[in-house]
A protein has these predicted regions:
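N-terminal alpha/beta PP-like core and its mobile active-site loop of ThDP/TPP-dependent enzymes
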Residues: 2-339, 388, 469-472
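Phosphate/pyrophosphate-binding active-site segments
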Residues: 2-19, 23, 167-171, 182-184, ...
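Active-site diphosphate/adenylate-binding microenvironment
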Residues: 23-24, 32-34, 41-44, 49-54, ...
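Small/polar loops that bind or transfer phosphate-bearing groups
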Residues: 41, 64, 88-89, 144, ...
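Short acidic/His/Gly/Ser-rich catalytic and metal-binding motifs that mark active-site loops
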Residues: 49, 177-181, 252-255, 355-358, ...
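A general structural motif
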Residues: 65, 123-126, 192-206, 262-265, ...
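Active-site flanking residues adjacent to catalytic metal/cofactor-binding acidic residues
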Residues: 116, 283, 307-308, 394, ...
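Thiamine diphosphate
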Residues: 122-123, 313-314, 322, 329-330, ...
Length: 562
């Protein structure tokens, strides 16, 4: 479980503690007010901040590598929707968190990273210009000083929420223990511009949808952030439309008419139905190359309208309407009458359990051509074995092609991908720890590859410490599978793409977990037995999967790139 220190009782006429009455303490007090948890790793630059918080019993989870400080906070936000907070020391500590900070920026995660920084007198031999480094990743840095410590910390949280982006709050080393001074005036934060719905756009889109024979609605994370999924489902139900989501909004509609995740993770029989749509309304999703299967998700004849309140990235052939999402969808709902008959009447099988389960064309043999387990068969079996009330967290790597396709989740905040925006691996253990803190009542399931697992291995211990009940599934092909299928298949030498076999179950046991190695589907029974008898603890399942089975999204990518 997450460790927090015990609050020290106050004593009469006690000497002032070193973490009281200074800039770091003021920042800490605002963090305690604005965030529900702090994720970090202590060093010279943030020790006073952390001490102030842990002394008072504020929830704090320590990472073992700074990369996990931000990935924990990132995943905490994705699992709860609340703003998150992380902290590192200056220099090397900040640099270690840079990849996960860039991921948070590209994934549009509102969090505040409180970082120690160089003193105001200038860079020391072991400092870097952290503000410039953050700017290179598109992240704004604010600086806490004696005259603005409280106000600027509030500003950092406000800015993160308004822009849906990470913000760095720097505490210069020589100011951390400085006493507060006369408050400096702080200009009000400019209001975020509104994008009201144009009535002409509403009338036109409502007419297009009402006139469609096979309407489909695709929702992304933007629809979740706008709290627009309920009215959007209302629009779909009136039209008799089918639904799809982005991976970050999985199961947002909670509807039997949901075809699942759009893009490279779409099941083949569901894809066949989706491609029949004649009008598609895309709400709060980017329609990037992965979502559109490199432009093949829908045929060219499909009319696509994309609604979002962010600038148009210019991807795909969709007509773009910039508008605040929820008001726009509520306006549509008022304009669309109930339709009959509908597309749903012509495809009743979509709502049936048989359609939502494995399709005969996807039925997988137990083993791949090399005699190791077929990952499709493994993950399909795990969907039946793992508790239904689960959070599924994924690291990055070739293996991501199977978990989103075969593992169901109870709500859109239970499918967590950290690393995909920046195309990074190694963030799994930290992300899973953040999810365990955010949703302790659920079983946290981390699905990782062996390459990413080894990269982030230091924070397996963090995951064990932060998790009430969890399962680590390592889909272990003894390789960097993505590179193997993209480049070795073209004749490049594979030596650097291969990894000597590692027994992650043994590593987990050494750190206090239970676990086993699986070479057959029958070996998954050990996990099933453990789940039946344990309400707490972590189980590490190392699955020896085939190097010869290629994920569908990877095959699409290779084909698109030629």
């Amino acid at each position: 479980m997450t460790s927090t220190s015990t609050e020290v009782p106050a004593t009469g006429n006690a000497t002032k503690l070193p973490d009281e009455g200074n800039v770091a303490a003021i920042v800490a007090d605002v963090v305690a007010e604005r965030a529900g948890h702090l994720f970090g790793l202590m060093g010279n630059g943030n020790v006073h901040l952390i001490s102030r918080l842990t002394r008072r019993g504020f929830p704090f989870t320590s990472a073992r590598h700074e990369a996990a400080t931000v990935s924990m906070a990132d995943a905490y936000h994705r699992a709860t929707g609340g703003v998150a907070a992380a902290t590192t020391t200056y220099g090397a500590g900040f640099a270690n968190a840079y990849t996960t900070l860039a991921e948070a920026r590209m994934a549009r995660i509102p969090l505040v990273l409180v970082a120690g920084d160089a003193p105001t007198t200038g860079l020391r031999p072991f400092d870097i210009d952290q503000a410039k480094a953050a700017k290179a990743a598109g992240v704004v840095t604010l600086v806490a000083r004696p005259g603005n410590a409280a106000a600027i910390t509030h500003r950092a949280f406000d800015l993160a929420l308004q822009t849906v982006q990470p913000v760095v709050l720097a505490i210069p080393y020589d100011l951390a223990t400085a006493p507060p001074s006369v408050p400096e005036p702080l200009e009000p934060l400019p209001a975020k511009p509104a994008w009201p719905a144009d009535p002409d756009d509403l009338d036109r889109v409502a007419g297009l949808l009402a006139g469609a024979e096979r309407p489909l609605i695709l929702a992304g994370r933007g629809a979740l952030l706008a709290r627009a999924t309920e009215p959007l489902r209302g629009v779909g139900d009136r039209l008799g439309a089918l639904f799809m989501t982005s991976v970050m909004a999985a199961n947002a509609f909670d509807s039997p008419w949901d075809l699942g995740i759009a893009g490279g993770f779409t099941r083949s029989h569901r894809l066949d139905v989706a491609r029949q749509a004649d009008v598609v309304l895309v709400v709060g999703a980017s329609l990037n190359t992965f979502q559109t299967r490199y432009g093949t998700l829908f045929p060219p004849s499909t009319r696509i309208i994309r609604v979002d309140n962010e600038p148009d990235p210019g991807l795909g052939a969709a007509e773009y309407i910039r508008a605040d999402i929820r008001p726009f969808i509520e306006g549509l709902l008022k304009r669309i009458p109930a339709a009959a008959p509908t597309w749903r009447d012509r495809v009743p099988e979509v709502s049936q359990a048989e359609f939502r389960s494995s399709h005969p064309s996807e039925d997988a043999a137990e083993f791949g051509p090399d005699g190791r387990l077929n990952p499709r068969a493994v993950v399909a079996a795990l969907d039946r074995i793992l508790p239904a009330e689960r959070s599924v967290v994924m690291d990055g790597g070739h293996f991501i092609g199977w978990a989103p396709m075969y593992l169901s989740v109870p709500d859109p905040h239970a499918m967590i991908f950290v690393g995909t925006a920046f195309q990074s691996i190694g963030m799994g253990f930290g992300s899973a720890a953040g999810v365990s803190v955010a949703r302790p009542e659920r079983t946290t399931v981390l699905v990782s590859g062996d390459g990413g697992g080894l990269m982030g291995l230091a924070d397996l211990e963090t995951f064990l410490r932060a998790t009430r009940r969890g399962v680590v599934v390592v889909l272990n092909d003894s390789a960097y599978g993505a590179e193997l299928h993209q480049y070795a298949a073209k004749g490049l030498h594979d030596q650097a793409m291969l990894i000597d076999e590692v027994d992650f179950a043994a590593v987990g046991r050494a750190l206090g977990a239970e676990g086993s190695k699986a070479h057959t589907l029958a070996d998954l029974g050990r996990l099933q037995e453990w789940l039946a008898t344990h309400e707490e603890g972590v189980y590490v399942l190392d699955v020896a999967i085939s190097q010869k089975v290629v994920a569908e999204y990877m095959a699409e990518s290779v084909a698109a790139k030629g």
